[in-house]
Amino acid sequence: MLASAAELYAIELGEGPPLLMLHGVTANAYIWLPVMELLADSYHCVAIDQRGHGRTGMPRDGQFDAAAYARDAADLAAFIGRGPVTLVGHSLGARNAIVAGAMRPDAIAGVIAIEFTPFIDKAAFDALDTRVTGGPRSFGDLGDLTGYLSWRYPGLPPDAVSRRASHGYAARADGRLVPLADAGAMRATCAGLREDLAPDLRRLGVPAVLVRGADSRFVSDQAFRAACALRPDLPAVVVGGADHYVPEERPEEVAEIVRAFAAGLAEPAATPGNRRSTS
């Protein structure tokens, strides 16, 4: 139980240095499961349903801005109580990780920010609003739901679609499947994503790496380059064969990025500001 939020639902796997994984908007902790399974031999992986998402309740403070989400992550990192925690965030989760790292460097060892940067185009946020607030809100059965998710996320492998269907929806009284993510919370969250992230990235004092999917239409190459120019000291990775949903589409590459980054925390990397691509 955190001071500002409802009780956070979490899944955990493995033993070792702690990693706290933060999902994107409308998603849930289970999108991280393949990455967690790849890292569990060396790390204590914790993934949460963030406020208003999944099986986590609505926050008592009713807030869905960057600071509120970041406080949850930072407070949970401190609660884990095994020294500073590395945050691994995707999309909304990456934004929250950057803000938390800037807010609480005492609790955060480092930040892996996947598919969220400053300078994202307004058109990308408008398209996100349409996807999140539009579309059907209930489904007659699992087949209908799976078909919809496969259409909405064409790049996701079948196992990722199945996890989203199984862990992001529940049956209501009439038997129809509805999202666990609260509709009002999602609208407020999408509005909050438009906050200017540049000041937080500029003052982020803990080690970090910026990650983009090579085919992403959310974080454009121009936006990513601008973020890298803002912080030329930070390493950057472009993951080939992935669009926005890098952790679900390329879990092996994400696990490799996490291992390399965590190794750099233990032993400083030789070349800051290095930008590389994976195939």
Residue ranges, per PLM feature:
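Alpha/beta-hydrolase fold catalytic core
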Residues: 1-19, 40-43, 81-84, 232, ...
